[in-house]
Amino acid sequence: MVSIVNIFMDYWFAEIITIGNEVLSGKTVNTNASHIGRRLTSLGFTVRRITAVMDEVDEIASAFREAIDRKPRVIVSSGGLGPTWDDKTAEGLAKALGVNLELNKTAFDMILEKYMTRKIPITEERKKMAYMPYGAIPVENNEGIAPGIYVYHNNIDILATPGVPREMENVLENFINKMLRNRSNLKYLEDFIYVENVMESSLAPYVKELVKKYDIYIKTHPKSYEMSHPILEIQIAGSGKQEEEIKVKIEKVKFELLDAIKKLNGIIRNSL
Amino acid sequence: MVSIVNIFMDYWFAEIITIGNEVLSGKTVNTNASHIGRRLTSLGFTVRRITAVMDEVDEIASAFREAIDRKPRVIVSSGGLGPTWDDKTAEGLAKALGVNLELNKTAFDMILEKYMTRKIPITEERKKMAYMPYGAIPVENNEGIAPGIYVYHNNIDILATPGVPREMENVLENFINKMLRNRSNLKYLEDFIYVENVMESSLAPYVKELVKKYDIYIKTHPKSYEMSHPILEIQIAGSGKQEEEIKVKIEKVKFELLDAIKKLNGIIRNSL
């Protein structure tokens, strides 16, 4: 059986870490991880793991350390950069890297300027956001106060972004535009087929054959009741150096799938 | 500084594993993890980690193995139990436990009955859903075909549920009602305050003091722009053996927080 690893070339793999108890208790749905996942995928990376941990220094440190040990090309975290007692990402990351946490002068200037222009005094809590691991580079946050933290370590681009979605997205884009060193030259393309009246288990043997034949990624997502009223979303995804080549491969796979669906009396839909 | 661990007594901690490339690429938001997190939290568990991994046997096995090594009381996974080539959770779990994957007769009977009553023939793909780690107990799935997988290992209740949300929720409830051995006697309570016109960084020193004073969990979630128009959601959460005791503590904390908010010219809102 063809492994996905072959297709996606795991040299360009990425990991995501989200920090915050609210995700673990289910209070907050982890949309930050989805956004980061989509963005990294669009750049040709394959996200191989997402880890959500509590606001505790040791948990954060171990999540970063374990991710670093798996040698991805990029690690992006979100959460834990704010001014409160439970914002501990900078400390956790420093511990994972084995360096000191120290006042980053550039970060402090960024923060100071934002408060000063609004005539708001700087406090210990506000100053806290300028503490970063030794050697880190602050990343501009145009949507809020806390700068992102960028570190290049063991050939891995490591970025910590704030947890507020708008700020996370902004810091992530600034990092991609100005700092990201490991750039995949892979293109990623995907296409979908929506089908009614075909059970996932009926289509399964065809999908298995096509995955083998084309060395491509096909996944069926059941969207309704398997037996009484089956609706399937079929995802066909590939990545490679030549966009045209992937396009052609996906088209061929779609053609064969549509043929199989016809045999199984499936009804093609335009959307879900 | 008071650690959350003290408050939540991590003897009752839990982990969640979700299996599926669609979560990693950001195609699907991980609402399954949120549901499982909320449900386990309501039972008095503290979810300490959520790990999302690819549909690969080795990745699934390592996620389970690492979770088992951290000695939680419960591990709940979702995804990867279906009939297709990329459904590999049973195999990954067997590998993590160091046991064989084998045809589970009870599971096979469950599956057979569902197809037979609808006069649908059994195929290799459909039979696949009956393969489970040696010693596993199938968990009834009243919303679909694939049964859940329950294993009691190293004093840990391990449950694998399907990835379709409706099926996951049903299998989870069947497991809680019939199989869950490690039952927390802790009650968990939480309350919220919504406030306008107070910056998170202004409230931070008060929150820090109250966390110390009451040994309770307080978290501020900024919902708008920190400086131009700050809106905060303040979460106050506690758990313990006596429901009344936690209630009183949360009320006292709320009282002191409202006092601090008044000092900071905050405006209390009824909701976000």
UniProtKB/Swiss-Prot annotation, chains A, B:
InterPro entries, per database record: CinA (IPR050101), CinA_Arc (IPR023055), MoaB/Mog-like_dom_sf (IPR036425), MoaB/Mog_dom (IPR001453)
Entries under SUPFAM superfamilies matching the protein: Molybdenum cofactor biosynthesis proteins
Top-level taxon: Archaea
Recorded family membership: Belongs to the CinA family.
Name assigned to this protein: Protein SSO0103
Organism: Saccharolobus solfataricus (strain ATCC 35092 / DSM 1617 / JCM 11322 / P2)
Lineage, broadest ranks: Archaea, Thermoproteota, Thermoprotei, Sulfolobales, Sulfolobaceae
